Amino acid sequence: MLLVVIFSVNAQVPQGFNYQATVRTSSGDLVMNQNVYFKFNILQGSQTAVPGYVEIHYVPTDDLGQVTLVIGQGSASTGVFAEIDWSLGSYYLGIEIDTNTGNGYIAMGTTQF
């Protein structure tokens, strides 16, 4: 008896990445029950590369100053999340925040992921 098994494997593009943060003022006070802007920059190859994908989220903090969102499901201003080719090497995530208008972002850091 000959048994032939064929597997079909489809690579799936991630729909996004969960992100959670606690928002504080520069003096360390919690930013509670207030809408804040987050800007996420995805850079390929180095921390100083030009972002290939940028998105913005406008989300409320809760009673503890926390936000929860999905990177990849915000308002894209550069690029298309689903078109990122994750096999092309290292990627970095830059995070910026603005607790006021969406025009005065403060860089919170960039990390490889």
Model-assigned labels for residue ranges:
Residues 1-3, 9-113:
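Family-positioned intrinsically disordered, low-complexity linker/tail segments enriched in G/S/T/P
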